[in-house]
Amino acid sequence: MPRKFPLEKTRNIGIMAHIDAGKTTTTERILFHTGKIHKIGETHDGDSQMDWMKQEQERGITITSAATTAFWKEHRINIIDTPGHVDFTVEVSRSLRVLDGAVAVIDAKAGVEPQTETVWRQATEYKVPRIIFVNKMDKIGASFDYAVKTLYQRLGINASPIQLPIGSENEFKGIVDLLEMTGVEFLGTSDEKFKTIEIPEYMKEFAQNKRIELIEKWHNYDEELMMDYLNGKEITVEKLKNVIRQATLKADFFPVLCGSAFKNKGVKKILDAIIDYLPSPMDVSSIVGCNFENKEIIRKTSDNEPFTALAFKVMTDPYVGKLTFFRVYAGTIKTGSYVTNATKQVKERLGRLLQMHANSREEIKEVYAGDIVAAVGLKNTTPGDTLTSINDDIILESMNFPEPVIEIAIEPKTKADQDKIGIALSKLSEEHPTFKIYTNRETAQTIIAAMGELHLEIILDRLKTEFKVEANVNQPQVAYRETLTKISTTEGKFIRQSGGRGQYGHVIIRFEPNSDKGNEFINKIVGGVIPKEYIPAVKKGLEESLSNGILAGFPLIDVKATLIDGSYHDVDSSEIAFKIAASMALKQTKNEGNLVILEPIMEVEIITPNDYIGNVIGDLTSRRGKLENQDSRENTVIIKALVPLSEMFGYATILRSNTQGRASFIMQFLKYERAPKNIAEEIIKKRN
């Protein structure tokens, strides 16, 4: 069956922002104007179409990335609405990995906020072209100029308005288009009814100057346009749009729009800008992967190429079971076809193919290059896996997910719960790559780890509501880590004789710090001093010991282990002997005195009235906080600090008390850092 929409008329975009900037409301209005929904839902009322999870509706926030498809001016727009809370940043990251463009929503009063900076960095990492929508122009305190200024100050980007607001706060009533040099006045409460007007007299000179600023940015992009401008020739709207599009596609420039999604003002202009300035799959570079011999393979965005896709999300649907979301980069595939999971080297069957709208679905028979869809039947596929035609061996770059920083022990309340809890936790860990489950080797307790207190709260809530599992939990604990600080070469020799065949394994391993590169194993054995069939056992022994830690049972991270020598016995050597020998070698590093405890450091941003600065800073200092920056804004101050996570439990209550409930804060994981000696000794003592 031929595709309904040509690739050049397809857009794959995300909506991203800080929490409460209006992402989901913006998406709802887009769906309303494109005819996808006929009643507008509100996040604060708990009836948003895109926030379909019970936990989202209760909290008025987006937790997962919801996907939908809309149509505007003969174009198909695939939209992913992403979370704004820092605990769910990974949802944004994996969505950006498969998108071609994005709309960044900025609060007109707050400007660029902490999570805006985080998701902007993620989008820059993936080289995603973006347009910017300054939302909530009707809000008390809204300032378009201030919001635009924060784009330069906090993001350091090349952005310029292509629109100007007519009025602000309660007086926000229209938009000036700097390309057309005309105005739009909204009639009533939305942009359903509007009229085209001349630019108000008091704005004409200002608008003209802003248009000139816009044109003068393009001397590096279009010499002909600059020459026309310098020679006093008229610059056509089409010419300007084309140059803006080219610069936006390269992520060299970011057009700025304005409006109020809640009041339905300016939303149609966003849709026009998505089509005018954001890329189709054909505008994006060909996808690059490699084969098992590490040779580069390039796939063009075309239906005629071999099927190539990347899985980016897994979720459990109560009616159809496991759903795997994937982006098709090349080729086509039909329902019922077999594909290869090239990452895991297993064959999978696409039982059903679905076009999703939040949690509702439409069955489709075939998918094409550029599509974002969900499949039923992929049993072994997880986020980051490459799906290909049978016998194809291309593997796309996978996804990197941060390690969780907070954990709790969990146990089922009843025998019935015990039977269900393992399956439920396993399904939840498939959906959340930053949610981990492990067993404490000393206490035999099941430990669950996540990115923050809200993340844990959502997991526990879903256990109860979706999987009907009641569980007891203890207080959240910090997920400490261990690491090496200097190079050491140690020996592990395991010999056992007990009559008959014995056990013999002998290794010499050099251990060294591997800063921010994870754990790495290198085999430098030459001449067969250890037969190659025992090398995987050495690696396995190290992996298990690294995960169990040495000082206090916390996983060892950022360690490079190089196997440099050893010996074997023709009769007595075995895989288990070499596995134990490797573990013994790692444990010897404790005697070298170069192991340390690492603690997670959080980036904390507090917004407080001026009256309480002393209280807030004094409290942060008492929590081992390091002040990074202070930024005054009207009658408030924004304080940025780095604070160990262990000092932040219960902080919300203390902050309320210190500021009479008038301050707010947000925090996100930044890095692991060596714990002070007295703190480390206390941690080790508790664990041992």
Curated annotation (Swiss-Prot):
Cited InterPro entries: EFG_II, EFG_III, EFG_III/V, EFG_IV, EFG_V, EFG_V-like, EFTu-like_2, G_TR_CS
GO CC terms in record:
cytoplasm
Biological process (GO) annotations?
A: ribosome disassembly
**Domain tr-type G positions:** 8-282
Give a yes or no for keyword Cytoplasm in this entry: yes
Assigned keywords, A-Z: Cytoplasm, Elongation factor, GTP-binding, Nucleotide-binding, Protein biosynthesis
Specify the signal sequence span. none
Keyword Nucleotide-binding present in the record's keywords: the answer is yes
The record's GO molecular-function terms, alphabetically, read: GTP binding; GTPase activity; translation elongation factor activity
Positions annotated to bind GTP: 17-24, 81-85, 135-138
Return the HAMAP family for the record: EF_G_EF_2_B (MF_00054_B)
Q: Which PANTHER family match?
A: RIBOSOME-RELEASING FACTOR 2, MITOCHONDRIAL, TRANSLATION ELONGATION FACTOR G-RELATED
**Protein family according to the UniProt entry:** Belongs to the TRAFAC class translation factor GTPase superfamily. Classic translation factor GTPase family. EF-G/EF-2 subfamily.
Summarize the protein's role: Catalyzes the GTP-dependent ribosomal translocation step during translation elongation. During this step, the ribosome changes from the pre-translocational (PRE) to the post-translocational (POST) state as the newly formed A-site-bound peptidyl-tRNA and P-site-bound deacylated tRNA move to the P and E sites, respectively. Catalyzes the coordinated movement of the two tRNA molecules, the mRNA and conformational changes in the ribosome.
Q: What is this protein called?
A: Elongation factor G
Origin species, per record, is Apple proliferation phytoplasma
The coding gene here is fusA
